[in-house]
Amino acid sequence: HKIAKWAKENTKSNYDCVIGVSGGKDSTKQAITARDKLGLRCLLVNFQPEGITEIGSKNIENLKNQGFDVMSIRPNPKIMKLLIKHDFFKWLNPVKATEFALWSSTYIICDSFNIPLIIQGENPGLTLGASLTGVGTDSNCLNAEKLETLSTGWKDYLEIEGVEEKDLFLLHYDRKSLESKNVKGIWLNYFLKEWSNFESAKFSEKFGFESRPLSTDPNSIGTYVAEGSHPGTYFQLDTDLTQVNQLLKFIKFGFGQCMDHACYDILEGLLSRDEAIELVKKYDGKCSSNYIEKFCNYISITTEEFWNTAEKFRGNMWQKDDNNEWKNSVWELLK
């Protein structure tokens, strides 16, 4: 509560804090906690993803209706399409550009409105052990630019024909300006003992957050739905682009979101290791062909081009077996 008290005393604006939100489980919890537990006046900033889903639209509208001021930001869709296509072919990571904009939009609004405090949800350095990326394991979220995706600078996009620096304003923030104003940025999970994905989903459902039905086909989203904490019902709801990205992650690194979710659930004591391994081998890397076709149509490529490009990035954990089928050596480690 010390930091909340500091924000209220030091604000030069109508707001004590700014929070980046999608309307998903985590941002719903962040916003409600900041307002109701910490007593902060919050300005919510919503980065609208490309191809927002019906459930994603419902959830962001639901969060607005909980009684918040919300600014929605959507970078030029024509430019975003160029960036997403570029990132697919260059990095096999079609969500890279959206992550730049997703993070930066909150910081830009904070700077423009002179708001003293930025609240983010989960520090990957703390929960995933990703601290070697430079983001650290402390409470300071001004380090967000050091996250794996964001550290490969946005200037990379200037090599794209038809893209100028002015087009990329919403993709980067001025950390020096924020620091000169003594802006503080915190990861909320650093301060909350009861932070978990499952807990955030349960908490947010009480405030109208809607998840996928339990009848969802786990093969379509590449993770389990009925077991453990039911992650398939509440992860990655606002755009189908993330499902395609998880498939591509699986091809590059040998694991997708099912592995991520199973690790969380083992930590939470909601799955045994054996149950988790079985689920990973069943669903990891699966993705509905509808999502793939939708993505190919969006960036104007054929599905053949999609698969040929994905193959170029296939990680060395994949080996061909005697039947000429790909075998994932990561799974050999799951004993």
Predicted regions and their residues:
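Short, glycine-rich nucleotide/cofactor-binding loops
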Residues: 17-26
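Nucleotide-activated chemistry modules centered on ATP-dependent adenylation/adenylyltransferase
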Residues: 1-16, 33-335
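Hydrophobic positions on the alpha1 helix immediately C-terminal to the Walker A/P-loop
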Residues: 29-30
